[in-house]
């Protein structure tokens, strides 16, 4: 799920194509995550029958596997994962297996970046409120009636 607006990247499925592939969504299998020093990985196994309903332009015709899909494209096929995953390879002997990776500390870095952005936004709001209070106070002082001398 996206929390902000972005332009779709890749080739969007038609409503009819999407309906056909989503029939298989509950049968998609997600491996446990595994990692090396830089990345965490997982593989996603699509039902073999699903490959028959995925549009041909999603495939690399030279090797007979799915081509590397954009995040929007693989999400459009019904693959659901948290943010940061990148489709980087297809397993040629088993074309229904898609390999994904993301930086090892992606979620921690995302949380830290989100917290920093929220803190910055709060500081900006506080500064704006202080400026508004100062302006209101200045206007109020300017409007005070001078005491009359009798």
From Swiss-Prot:
Domain of life of the source: Eukaryota
UniProt record similarity statement: Belongs to the CKS family.
Misc. comment: Present with 8780 molecules/cell in log phase SD medium.
Signal peptide, first to last residue: none
Quaternary structure, from the entry: Forms a stable but non-covalent complex with the CDC28 protein and with a cyclin.
Residues annotated as transmembrane: none
Pfam families: CKS
SMART domains linked to this entry: CKS
Entry protein name: Cyclin-dependent kinases regulatory subunit
Keyword field: Cell cycle, Cell division
Ranges of Low complexity composition bias in the record: 115-137
InterPro entries for the chain: Cyclin-dep_kinase_reg-sub, Cyclin-dep_kinase_reg-sub_sf
UniProt GO MF annotations: cyclin-dependent protein serine/threonine kinase activator activity; histone binding; protein kinase activator activity; protein kinase binding; ubiquitin binding
